[in-house]
Curated annotation (Swiss-Prot):
Name of the molecule in the record: 23S rRNA (uracil(747)-C(5))-methyltransferase RlmC
Species whose genome carries this gene: Escherichia coli (strain K12)
Gene that this polypeptide is encoded by: rlmC
Enzyme Commission code: 2.1.1.189
Binding-site list for [4Fe-4S] cluster: 3, 11, 14, 87
Record function comment: Catalyzes the formation of 5-methyl-uridine at position 747 (m5U747) in 23S rRNA.
Amino acid sequence: MQCALYDAGRCRSCQWIMQPIPEQLSAKTADLKNLLADFPVEEWCAPVSGPEQGFRNKAKMVVSGSVEKPLLGMLHRDGTPEDLCDCPLYPASFAPVFAALKPFIARAGLTPYNVARKRGELKYILLTESQSDGGMMLRFVLRSDTKLAQLRKALPWLHEQLPQLKVITVNIQPVHMAIMEGETEIYLTEQQALAERFNDVPLWIRPQSFFQTNPAVASQLYATARDWVRQLPVKHMWDLFCGVGGFGLHCATPDMQLTGIEIASEAIACAKQSAAELGLTRLQFQALDSTQFATAQGDVPELVLVNPPRRGIGKPLCDYLSTMAPRFIIYSSCNAQTMAKDIRELPGFRIERVQLFDMFPHTAHYEVLTLLVKQ
């Protein structure tokens, strides 16, 4: 992938950009095999990759510069701002949005937040695009609601320029820390969720719900999990750390009982909406802590699917699963180091199948799907 920002030394986020994709995949596979070297693996499936540029469905832009000449991108460690509107990881459809947002920031008087001076209002611009219909969700992360009335007043102009903006919100993040969002979300549009569709499964994206940033590879990840589950004798499963329900909604059949657990209530609202659209009445999604939910249950289903954050599922949940011993565990991980650590805590299971998904090209990161079977 060619990147003028990298060539000019202005951005180093894609540390592996100089390596061809096949070399990147080989290095990631070697890393994964090294992490799982202590465990016999019955089947290594071929790694899955997608496009090497223009694949991201989301931009998280730090806003800096002045209100008349805002920069959208990042801050270097020394505080120097860098405009990343031309980053080749973004699809071409993002360029007109960035181009319209810069004059809009001036129109609405949204002074960029200055970290050194602790002054200004606009901290971040968060943009998400649906692959299904090209609709977009735009979030303005502000320090306070001081500029809210001005923003609302200027909004018709932005809608005129960018009719693809289906959901627009203001998020209030008052803390002087590098935290992307606060708890308060103010909707400026009637529509509150972005419609997405992977493999004919309707999915919804709300402002404070996690959604994979590489849709081409994520849709293959969900489809693979579905195929693996269909090969197993499963009538009842848990989907822990389920997010908007991507895994559970793909894996469920009309006669299957499924419980999806996720701490974020916004994500659970999305999952419930999708289940209703699919007419799946035996799916139950609840906004709870996954570990607390599981460890409070007196029995387990045949299959437990886990998709934890980078820290992994942790010892308490590993101990519970070791004791209760479901027949199958499917572990989807964005951090193979913590997954390997967790598998070490599950001695009663063997690894039947592993597959790497190159969700983050040009970096050392990857996603991995693992099928564990009770010995």
